[in-house]
Amino acid sequence: MRLQYFGHSCFRLISDTGTTIVCDPYDENMVGLTMPRTRTDVVTVSHHHADHDCTTNIVGSYALLDCKVTCACDDIAIDTIETWHDEEKGAKRGADIVFTFVVDGIRVAHLGDIGFVDPHVVKALRGFDVIMLPVGGVYTVDAKAAAELAAAINPKTIVPMHYMTSAHKFTIGGLDKFIAEATARGWTIADNGADTLRLEDAPENATTQVVVLQQFED
C-alpha cells in the first residue's frame, strides 16, 4: 500500500492492485496550494467545507462518499465513524466523518477536521496502523490535543495534516508545535522529504512514529 500526500488534508491511497482513494480534495484557490489533477476510484469527503470537498481536479468517473457508509471498493474495505468538527458537538462547525480503510491488511484512518478528543473515536481506532491527523488547531484539534488523541489511539504511524505552510491563504498552527509534542512523548520523527509512504516498507518501531510527508506532485 502507498499513501501519497496531496497537501492540506488530502491524500491518495493506492492498494497493491492499483485501487485508489482520494481523501478530502481541496479548493486550491481557497487553500493556496496546488491540488494535483488525478483520477481515482473513490473520493471521500469528511465534511462540506471547500478545503475538504472540492473535486475540480478529480477527473474521470469515481464514487463520492460523504456520509456514513460501510462498503468496499474492489480490495479496499471502507467504513466511517461519525464525530464533530468542534468541542461543542457541531454547534460551531458541524459534523465530521472519520473514514477508515483496510488496504492490503493495513488499517488506516483519515480523521478529517476532528475538533476534540472524542472517546468514541478513540475506542474505534485504538491500535490502528496509520492515522492521518489534523494538528494545526483553529478549526481542528490543536497540537496538544492532537497528541493526546494520538496517544489514546496508539497507532503505529501518525501522518500529520491540516497545518500552516508558507503557501496557505488562511492562518492555522504550524507543524512545529505538534513535532514538539511528539518529541516530548518519545515518538520517532521521520522527515526525509518523501511524498509517499510505502506502508509495507515502514520499519517496526517500539514507539509510535510520526511521518512528515511533502506534497506529492504528478
Predicted segments — roles?
Residues 9-48, 52-66, 82-96, 114-124:
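Pre-active-site segment of Zn-dependent metallo-hydrolases
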Residues 21, 42, 106-108, 130, ...:
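Structural motif
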Residues 2-5, 20-24, 77-84, 98-100, ...:
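Active-site-proximal beta-strand elements of phosphoester/diester hydrolases
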Residues 87-153, 170:
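Active-site-proximal loop/helix segments of hydrolase catalytic cores
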Residues 41-46, 134, 158-162:
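Short internal beta-strands
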Residues 52-105, 186-207:
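Metallo-beta-lactamase
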Residues 4-6, 93, 157-218:
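Binuclear metal-ion centers of metallo-dependent hydrolases, dominated by the metallo-beta-lactamase
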Residues 8, 18, 27, 154-163:
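Internal catalytic or translocation cores that form aromatic/hydrophobic pockets or channels
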